[in-house]
């Protein structure tokens, strides 16, 4: 990828060293990746949008890739991660008071918090896969998930430090990444102990046309070095984030938004999600929600599966805000 003019550097922000990939000049687009992912998730968008006259910036979030991974699980709250990104923008683009944000998966969760905490910093948001989720003051998140899905649900299995990491280590880094990146079951993801992803760990995984062995190997090289703990720590802070954000109960997102999701995405198919997105709930909490796009036959990693369409969707939206 370096040969295509993507520049890499390390920036000191918020007490950590953050690795950033960037290319291009013009209005800044900040790309925020999810789990288990890297700046690399946005490789197609970086090339396309920089060619259209934007400065594309894609960091590895704390805990990922070539960015520092603090040891304490409680160093991965929404306040830490939003703090990293605001500090990054202050450092690399002090002249750009507002930027575009494109986010996916956990990156979208972080982007929604960014909208709540610092709406003054965003021109517009394109959120992929994960819609805004209003805070329920009555019930903590993990208890809610356990009540709906049971203890084998992947987010519940992620809670106990070290447990899922040991199971992932047994299966092997490359295998885990292939399982996640190629996951197309629209139903919830269960990871029962000792059962992995529900198929024998020596069963071959055929990669889709949009994901090559070389691309998987790039991921594997980075995750071999870091392990999965940094990324999983985000899930371990769901309840702490809930506690820390009491003051934002009922708050609206006052940023222009475009939301894009695949109809095979497990998040889109979770209980209540479609009704919330399409029947007024989403628009109530994000009154500047301008477009909802549902991509047929597309699963969770849509920016990699359908890069050309996603690039067009991003550009068609953000060009209205110059």
Describe the role of every protein-language-model region:
Residues 19-69, 104:
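Conserved HGGG/HGGXW glycine-rich cap/lid loop of the alpha/beta-hydrolase fold
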């Amino acid at each position: 990828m370096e040969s295509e003019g993507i520049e890499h550097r390390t920036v000191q922000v918020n007490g950590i060293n953050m690795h950033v990939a960037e290319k291009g000049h013009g209005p800044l687009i900040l790309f925020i990746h999810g789990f288990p992912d890297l700046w690399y998730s946005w490789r197609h968008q970086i090339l396309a949008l920089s060619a259209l006259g934007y400065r594309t910036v894609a960091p590895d979030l704390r805990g990922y890739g070539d960015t520092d991974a603090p040891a304490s699980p409680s160093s991965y709250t929404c306040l830490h991660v939003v703090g990293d990104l605001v500090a990054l923008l202050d450092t690399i683009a002090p002249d750009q008071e507002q930027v575009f944000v494109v986010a996916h998966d956990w990156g979208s969760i972080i982007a929604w918090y960014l909208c709540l905490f610092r709406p003054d910093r965003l021109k517009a948001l394109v959120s992929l896969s994960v819609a805004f989720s209003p805070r329920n003051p009555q019930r903590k998140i993990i208890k809610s998930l356990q009540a709906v899905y049971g203890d084998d649900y992947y987010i519940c299995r992620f809670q106990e430090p070290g447990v899922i990491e040991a199971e992932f280590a047994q299966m092997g880094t490359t295998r885990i990444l292939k399982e996640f990146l190629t996951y197309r079951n629209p139903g919830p993801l269960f990871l029962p102990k000792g059962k992995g992803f529900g198929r024998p760990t020596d069963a071959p995984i055929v990669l889709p046309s949009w994901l090559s062995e070389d691309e998987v190997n790039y991921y594997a090289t980075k995750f071999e070095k870091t392990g999965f703990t940094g990324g999983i720590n985000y899930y371990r802070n769901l309840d702490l984030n809930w506690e820390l954000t009491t003051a934002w109960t009922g708050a609206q997102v006052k940023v222009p938004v475009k939301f894009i999701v695949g109809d095979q995405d497990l998040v889109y198919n979770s209980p209540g999600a479609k009704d919330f997105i399409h029947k007024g709930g989403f628009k109530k909490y994000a009154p500047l929600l301008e477009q909802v796009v549902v991509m047929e036959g597309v699963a969770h990693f849509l920016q990699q599966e359908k890069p050309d369409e996603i690039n067009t969707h991003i550009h068609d939206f953000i060009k209205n805000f110059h």
